[in-house]
């Protein structure tokens, strides 16, 4: 079968473009500062990109933690670490973690995929997220840390029980969030972004968007914005769409849905 004709281009840089919903999220994060904001939604829908754009537009500094079940307390709030003394002797000293640094210095604290974080660590953060705005850290020699007025915690989360290695968010944590928003649509303006990546090739952009719409009619095959952009970048590097889909996306769905993915792609990208 022949493929849609496309002139391969070197990978193009593109700026983040957001939908109206995405722009609203960026605006609302600023309005909610310094209170906790939690954005819940499937992987690749643009949650973290929207947070990063909020940070960039407002010229803020941020600390980042990519949450996972094996994360230790010292990865978040800090811990004792070995260091070398003035006479080259081994010492043990306290080192603030990213959360503590952000709390002291008034930075944004991005907790990415917080539903993968061990709940005992979440409990330690509670008092820093309510009206008391205090971080208890007795191990450091500073039993109570007064939090900077500009400290702002933003968390992203993948829904539990939907194929992600996640846990339910603590109800006490939810109650501390000024914004607790479920994202059910891509926050990225996908068409504009694909036009950037593919150098304005309208036929290929249309094919990608129609194929993505078909996939999203079934939750088990729904494609994320991230994967859609990866596929477009692969096409821009010279892969055919079918090659890109076979290498990037086909094996991300269950075996019984692989045929659906490939048949749908063939209908849009081959003639």
Show the residue positions of the predicted features.
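C-terminal regulatory/interaction module of P-loop NTP-utilizing enzymes
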Residues: 1-271
């Amino acid at each position: 079968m022949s493929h849609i004709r496309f002139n391969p281009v070197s990978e193009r840089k593109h700026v983040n473009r957001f939908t109206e919903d995405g722009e609203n999220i960026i605006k609302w994060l600023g309005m909610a500062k310094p209170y906790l904001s939690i954005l819940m939604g499937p992987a690749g829908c643009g949650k973290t990109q929207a947070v990063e754009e909020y940070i960039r537009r407002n010229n803020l500094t941020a600390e980042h933690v990519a949450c996972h079940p094996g994360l230790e307390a010292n990865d978040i709030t800090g811990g004792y670490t070995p260091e070398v003394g003035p006479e080259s002797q081994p010492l043990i000293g306290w080192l603030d973690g990213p959360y503590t640094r952000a709390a002291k210095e008034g930075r944004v604290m991005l907790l990415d995929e917080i539903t993968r974080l061990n709940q005992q660590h979440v409990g330690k953060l509670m008092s820093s997220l309510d009206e008391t705005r205090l971080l208890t850290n007795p191990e450091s020699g500073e039993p109570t840390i007064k939090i900077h007025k500009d400290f702002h915690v933003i968390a992203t989360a993948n829904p539990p029980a939907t194929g992600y290695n996640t846990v339910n968010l603590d109800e006490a944590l939810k109650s501390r969030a000024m914004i607790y928003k479920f994202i059910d649509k891509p926050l990225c303006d996908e068409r504009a972004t694909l036009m950037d990546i593919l150098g304005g090739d309208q036929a290929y952009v249309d094919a990608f968007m129609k194929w993505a719409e078909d996939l999203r009619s079934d939750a088990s095959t729904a494609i994320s914005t991230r994967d859609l952009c990866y596929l477009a970048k692969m096409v821009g590097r010279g892969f055919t769409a079918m090659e890109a889909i076979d290498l990037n996306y086909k094996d991300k769905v269950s075996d019984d849905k692989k045929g659906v993915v490939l048949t749908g792609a063939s209908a849009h990208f081959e003639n």
